Amino acid sequence: MKGLAFSLLLSLVSPCPIRAADQLEVTFDGVVIPVDIKDLVAWGRSGGVSNTELGIWLDLLEPASRRGMLELLRAPLITNRSMARQMLDSWAGRRLLDEVADLVRVDDDTVGVTVLNTLEVLLSKQPHVTSLDLLEALPAKRVRLDLDGLLGVAEHWRGQLKHQQALVNRLDQIPITAVAPSQSISIDATTGRAPLSKALTVAHRPRPLQLQLWQPPAERFRSNARDRSWIVLMPGLGGSPDHFRWLGRLLSAKGWPVVVLEHPGSDSEAVGAWLQGRRRPPGAEVLPDRLKDLEAVLQAQASGSLPVVGNKVVLVGHSLGSLTALLAAGLRPQPGLERRCRKALDDLPLSNLSRLLQCQLSAVPLPSIEPPSQLLAVVGMNSFGSLLWPRTRPVRLSVPVLFTGGTLDLITPPLNEQLELLVATAPAPGSGAVVVQGASHFSPIRVEGQAGEGKGNDLFQLGEELVGVQPLQVQALLGEEIVAFLTGINATSSPAGPSLVHRQVGELHLHRMDPAGAASLLSGS
């Protein structure tokens, strides 16, 4: 048990820089336990060979625990100097460092300035930084680790994961209403009909926006519809129009013209530049330009300079693209965001990373843009906004919405985000949410080679641990649900269905719900 506790301590400490000054003071159950840092560093650098009192004590650990501690101490924490510097200089990086500083106190530094400065010095001298490097370099008279606080954070994380698992259990209890075999996926992301490319000059950017236009086949064009609609599709943070060729192709084949936006500064090129250490990671500060991108596309279509026919528009987005759509629809953060964020970010938000973007929005001035008068509906894949529009302060969205998500999503978990949003935005009739078991935040993204064995040459090198199970089947199900939603809102009347629907397609389970169904699931959380 002691070995397990000490391994936990080191696993939590190792990412946080501590200097081998004199002692590391560990606060545990109200008791301060001193650990000689010099002895700990010597033990780590020697590969576990040390005759000090601490070394003798550590020799009593189980071999697996000893190896794990040595690996944590000696493994590189930072392997890309430039990328790490940019991350530490970003809003999200500073916010995370601030939270870590509450748990690992260096002298009287409560905001992590000492840690940040030490990392900067180390990164200016060497390309890689290990825990041992930080232990030796951090200038401090006293370092205190609040193990009670760390255990509290871990308990909070476990609680959040239990809430998500409880949602899965409640979904499993809903009787299956339809069973179908797996769908045959015959269209790959790089084959079949290709989109048209269009460059759109905009006033707020130095270079034209690059758009993908998916025009319906002549025989499928919805020329008889009273309110002919078209679709604007916006990728998420680090996303590319090519990630959604499958959806553009599908929707245009069903009769809707589709325009897929590029968002310079928050697209795959921007995130790639961050990974190479050439810029800060993009965050919520990109939203004003994203909103202006969308406004420019809508104006170009209305003036006829964008060759897309339609009287009504549907805004579709993935992740940050979904948030862009909701803001464009007229929603603005409800008062009290900073207070809600102080509470939400009191623990490291690793089970809901979207909270960092939501909270950064309090420091971002949003442009004054009128909601498009021709707005027909909003579709948000892996959407988020529970801190912006909490259930306790609902805000009215005047058009139908469809939110989709997956049970393996720890960036925008469906229980906290899509279901909360559906209830909080009090949307128009016809609104709903779809949750796919085993799908993740990246399931809607199709990259080159995903249909085969390879991962392709793409920024998103996605394996099953990130993209979830059966991504092509998940995309087929999501496409089917989006088409059904769009067809329903165009219908003159549609009969009300059950609040909760459980479909099984092959091995996948899909759950569709209206706001009442979402509220009933949330009430059980």
Q: Where are the regions a protein language model picked out?
A:
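Cap/lid segment of the alpha/beta-hydrolase catalytic domain
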Residues: 238, 242-245, 250, 262-288, ...
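Gly/Ala-rich beta-loop-alpha elbow adjacent to hydrolase catalytic centers
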Residues: 236, 316-325
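Short beta-strand/loop motif that positions the catalytic acidic residue
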Residues: 397, 403-405
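Short beta-strand element of the alpha/beta-hydrolase
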Residues: 225-236
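Mature extracellular/secreted ectodomains of secretory-pathway proteins
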Residues: 31-181
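N-terminal cap/lid segment of alpha/beta-hydrolase-fold proteins
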Residues: 172-226
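Alpha/beta-hydrolase fold nucleophile elbow
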Residues: 306-319
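Alpha/beta-hydrolase active-site loop
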Residues: 280-307, 323, 327, 337-352
